[in-house]
Amino acid sequence: MEVNEVDAREIIEMIAKSKKKTPIVAYIKGKLDGIDFSKFKFFGNDQFGVLFGEYEDFRELLEKYGEKIEDYHLEVKARNSALPLADITKYRARIEPGAIIRDMVEIGEGAVIMMGAVINVGAVIGEGTMIDMNAVVGGRAIIGKKCHIGAGAVIAGVIEPPSAKPVVIEDEVVVGANAVILEGVTVGKGSVVAAGAVVTKDVPPYTVVAGVPARVIKQIDEKTKEKTRIVDELRNLE
């Protein structure tokens, strides 16, 4: 499985040096003619408008032009955020509403990211892999092709300490609902992690692990393959 692993130090440096942002959307009503909106993206007229910009700039706007603004509603999207969300239009994948994907995430063609899934900075999602509802893929985690990460599963992230080894889930792995894969673990190709398992050490290829902590309970057989079969039709983008 070939991947472009993101270096932890690169992420740390980017977070440390980035200008922290508090993005807002403001809906304002009043006598808006003569107000300087140059620091914002402004859509509206001289009576009503919508602003996209930074909280501090909006606070300064209120202080300067408060007598002209009759009312406003403010939506704060984040506070002192160090990294933006990803531009999901660049991915040839199915990404459902409510998924949260940070910048510097690689998502392969035909992948499926379901509602409520969270994918942190530097993670890699392989072609045809499904990240199910409310699953969490931590920073720098690497997931191969044609995997299924079950609802509520947690794939631990590793950004600090920067020397730590990220989680690697190889191709065609099925991780059951609410399972947890801890930092530094490699899950071998074609394996199955049972629902609710906590994986603390490497999993050999083509094995089934279960329990807390997870242990090998059997080798993959035809019955297991059928029960955990990946459905290609769910990855169809046409």
Curated annotation (Swiss-Prot):
The keyword Repeat applies. GO terms for biological process: diaminopimelate biosynthetic process; lysine biosynthetic process via diaminopimelate. Pfam families: DapH_N, Hexapep, Hexapep_2. One of its GO terms (molecular function) is tetrahydrodipicolinate N-acetyltransferase activity. CDD domains: LbH_THP_succinylT (cd03350). The keyword Ribosomal protein does not apply. Pathway: Amino-acid biosynthesis; L-lysine biosynthesis via DAP pathway; LL-2,6-diaminopimelate from (S)-tetrahydrodipicolinate (acetylase route): step 1/3. Its EC number is 2.3.1.89. It catalyses: (S)-2,3,4,5-tetrahydrodipicolinate + acetyl-CoA + H2O = L-2-acetamido-6-oxoheptanedioate + CoA. Keywords: Acyltransferase, Amino-acid biosynthesis, Diaminopimelate biosynthesis, Lysine biosynthesis, Repeat, Transferase. It is an enzyme of class 2 (transferase). InterPro entries: DapH (IPR019873), DapH_N (IPR013710), Hexapep (IPR001451), Hexapep_transf_CS (IPR018357), Trans_hexapeptide_repeat (IPR050179), Trimer_LpxA-like_sf (IPR011004). It comes from the Bacteria. PANTHER family: 2,3,4,5-TETRAHYDROPYRIDINE-2,6-DICARBOXYLATE N-ACETYLTRANSFERASE, ACETYLTRANSFERASE. Catalyzes the transfer of an acetyl group from acetyl-CoA to tetrahydrodipicolinate. Belongs to the transferase hexapeptide repeat family. DapH subfamily. This is 2,3,4,5-tetrahydropyridine-2,6-dicarboxylate N-acetyltransferase.
